[in-house]
Design a protein with these regions (language model features):
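Blade-edge beta-strand/turn elements of extracellular beta-propeller
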Residues: 44-46, 118-128, 168-178, 251-263, ...
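Short, conserved, GDST-rich strand-edge loop motifs in beta-rich repeat architectures
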Residues: 92-106, 205-237, 399-416
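Repeat-based blade/solenoid architectures
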Residues: 53-75, 126-138, 177-189, 238, ...
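Beta-propeller blade termini
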Residues: 73-83, 112, 133-147, 162, ...
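Hydrophobic beta-strand segments that make up the repeating blades of beta-propeller
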Residues: 86-93, 145, 149-154, 201-205, ...
């Protein structure tokens, strides 16, 4: 199986040129993305320091990691917590194994958007200065009061913050019954799985882990990597169990993991969560990227239960039938056929994976055919489809970083800090690596983890926030204006959940119909700007915007002006019977 992929990588190298990539272990394409001359399509700089995103991330040891707990890093969220129309930034933080003075404990950070390219840290004022082994974050208005609430996952008890609407948050975890079982939670997503108008909550769980009994580097086979003692896991450690909470509508949730048959899928190390209606039946499904084990694709049975169909659907393994070490995931219609596809990042000595949706309930691994099989050196985490040049074709951003600091000392063919990768969608089902010309925000090496994207300044140019291990976050700002048009859609549910999470949006512009969904969560344990962004290319108008709401209502909105964020309220459009379920 490995050799099949190795030969495929070598074939691509030869097709590109004799010097395009240099084979290494397992067909490793060892050339860095920063080594080829290219025309600038996008140019990203890291503007975090100037913008005020200065708080360091703290996550375990710096030079060595004794336990797997110290390696996973944290997610980030882009959301408008104060409803001023400008997205703000929330960065989850971790801690260390050693003792630390109480007043110096690292905390999560909330940054308020000042509308001028800068942010102000309002963490203390907002009541979000929580400490612990933070992991992921997802956003959703669970009580439909018009203000976005925050759910933060931890190694330990998770936390639900209710947005009070006055710039502050209240920890309502115990009241809401969503703390979990004290396990190691990772990715999460608010999702109205039963379409009752109230957001439910799905939480992925990684490893059943206890520092007191965990093996140490070199203790067993799973504690070695390429002959070097490293932290142990996840293989050899007990797996966690994913959780589902049903929103009762009174400020509380009910644990329905067993009732919904979520726990019938076992033996997986769950990492990131992405929701999508992959079979277009109007009911949200759930994809979980899993470390060192097959991915999970929970199909919504429309009766309050789910069935894992990843294997039969072709989304559990790569095309060689090999389970991969999945980290992050993103959803998008990369080839413009109206179906939602899945992209997943993986561990080093492997490629990322692109699953093309065939429209019949199955997927094909088209990684190599799409030109995405170039790199096996990097260890991928956060990833997102985003249209960097607004040409109407979603591009791909990948964040990388190794888990073993030892790679720098032992010269194992990888670096602990790795560059990001930016692929430009060519509009013909393939991608081109444009990292070399995409600016220092892409080519500078960091040990990245979480990634969220959004239109931070409402100008149609998508920015990205990246959490970095034991360093401040990065704020990747695109300096180029493409000249293409765009539109952003903010959904406001009335019968459906207020955020419109789960709504499928179709935009008709010229000869193209663009498709995406409103979703919470995704990437690596992160949450993106939920205003859905569409690049329109040279089209100077949109014919219509169609929204299929979770309630089942499908309606069209006409005469929406382009080059701006437009709000669409459920029930205010023209009813359309072409997509109701």
């Amino acid at each position: 199986l490995v050799r099949t992929r190795q030969l495929r990588v070598l074939a691509i190298c030869v097709a590109l040129s004799s010097h395009a990539c240099i084979p290494g272990p397992f067909g490793q394409a060892s050339q860095k993305p920063a080594e080829r001359e290219q025309k600038k399509i996008a140019y990203f700089v890291d503007d975090a320091a100037r913008a005020g995103l200065n708080a360091p991330n703290t996550f375990g040891g710096v030079d060595t990691k004794k336990f797997i707990l110290e390696t996973t890093g944290t997610g980030v969220a882009i959301f408008d917590y104060d409803n001023d129309g400008w997205p703000d930034i929330f960065v989850v933080n971790g801690t260390t194994l050693g003792p630390m003075p109480e007043k110096k404990q690292p905390t999560n950070h909330l940054y308020h958007n000042n509308h001028d390219g800068t942010f102000t840290d309002v963490t203390e004022k907002a009541g979000l200065a929580h400490s612990g082994w933070g992991q992921g974050v997802c956003v959703g208005d669970y009580d439909n009061d018009g203000y976005e609430d925050l759910f933060v996952t931890y190694y330990g008890k998770n936390v639900l913050y209710h947005n009070n609407g006055d710039g502050t948050f209240t920890d309502v975890t115990e009241k809401a019954h969503v703390a979990g079982n004290g396990a190691w939670s990772t990715g999460c997503a608010f999702v109205d799985y039963d379409r009752d108008g109230k957001l439910d909550l799905f939480v992925a769980t990684y490893v059943d882990f206890d520092v007191k009994t965990a093996p140490v580097p070199g203790e067993r086979a799973s504690c070695m990597w390429k002959g070097v003692p490293v932290m142990c896991g996840p293989r050899g450690l007990p797996w966690g169990k994913n959780m589902l909470f049903h929103n009762k509508g009174d400020g509380t949730f009910e644990a329905v993991t067993t009732k919904a048959k979520i726990d019938q899928t076992n033996g997986h190390y769950g990492f990131s969560v992405s929701t999508l209606d992959f079979d277009d039946d109007g009911w949200p499904d759930i994809f979980v990227a899993c470390d060192s084990t097959p991915s999970i694709l929970y199909h919504n049975n429309r009766d309050g239960t789910f069935t894992d169909v990843a294997v039969v659907a072709g989304a559990a393994f790569n095309e060689d039938g090999k389970e991969q070490a999945g980290m992050g995931s993103t959803i998008g219609d990369y080839n413009g056929d109206g179906r939602l596809d899945i992209f997943k990042t993986n561990f080093s000595d492997d490629t990322a994976t692109l699953y093309r949706n065939n429209g019949d309930g199955t997927f094909d691994d088209v990684t190599f055919a799409a030109g995405l099989g170039l790199y096996t050196k990097y260890l991928g985490w956060g990833t997102m489809f985003l249209d960097v040049d607004n040409d109407g074709w979603p591009d791909l951003l990948l964040v990388n970083g190794h888990v073993y600091p030892e790679v720098d000392k032992q010269h194992l063919g990888s670096d602990y800090q790795e560059p990001r990768i930016l692929y430009h969608n060519k509009g013909n089902g393939t991608f081109e690596d444009i990292s070399a010309s995409a600016g220092p925000g892409i080519t500078t090496a960091k040990s990245g983890r979480g990634l969220a994207v959004g239109d931070l300044w409402n100008d149609g140019r998508m920015s990205a926030v990246v959490s970095n291990m034991n360093a401040p976050a990065s704020l990747l700002v695109n300096q180029l204006k493409s000249g293409n048009h765009w539109i952003g859609i903010k959904t406001i549910g009335t019968k459906s959940n207020r955020d419109g999470i789960g709504a499928k949006i179709r935009v008709k512009a010229g000869e193209r119909v663009l498709v995406d969904e409103v979703r919470s969560g995704s990437s690596y344990d992160s949450n993106n700007d939920m205003r859905v962004h569409f690049g329109l290319g040279h089209n100077e108008r949109v014919d219509w915007v169609e929204v299929r709401w979770p309630s089942g209502l499908t309606e069209r909105f006409s005469n929406l002006q382009i080059d701006g964020i437009r709000s669409v309220r459920e029930g205010s459009g023209a009813a359309f019977n072409g997509g109701a379920h």
